[in-house]
């Protein structure tokens, strides 16, 4: 065998190995590929991805907090969901606690970077109020 045929055999072997590895990766991730395609199938012919979704890998207010009580979370309160932490409740303005009908709405509001909301802590002035007792119970 001359050197050129050895080189061609090596190149062909490497190409076949790369193809086999790619097929194996597709086989291993087939469920994830199907899920991604079904999620984004409506966008197949669109020029931009114009959907209302939050990529929580980029911004999460809990990323730099080490104390568990300081982390923001959504909890059920009076058949609505509210966003709470040790700092208090997320509020519309003043003492109006922001209520959400679904937990997804609460999560989207709490973890959206564009949302700069006020925080209302009922335990500062009235330590015995219903809101303060609830806040202490979930922390």
UniProtKB/Swiss-Prot annotation:
The keyword Transmembrane helix applies. It is a single-pass type II membrane protein. Residues 22-139 are virion surface. Its main location: virion. The chain crosses the membrane at residues 1-21. GO terms for cellular component: membrane; viral envelope; virion membrane. InterPro entries: Poxvirus_A28. Keywords: Disulfide bond, Fusion of virus membrane with host membrane, Late protein, Membrane, Signal-anchor, Transmembrane, Transmembrane helix, Viral envelope protein, Viral penetration into host cytoplasm, Virion, Virus entry into host cell. Pfam families: Pox_A28. It is found in: Virion membrane. GO terms for biological process: membrane fusion involved in viral entry into host cell; symbiont entry into host cell. It comes from the Viruses. The keyword Magnesium does not apply. Contains two intramolecular disulfide bonds. They are created by the viral disulfide bond formation pathway, a poxvirus-specific pathway that operates on the cytoplasmic side of the MV membranes. Disulfide bonds: none annotated. Belongs to the poxviridae A28 protein family. Envelope protein required for virus entry into host cell and for cell-cell fusion (syncytium formation). This is Envelope protein A28 homolog. It comes from Yaba-like disease virus (YLDV).
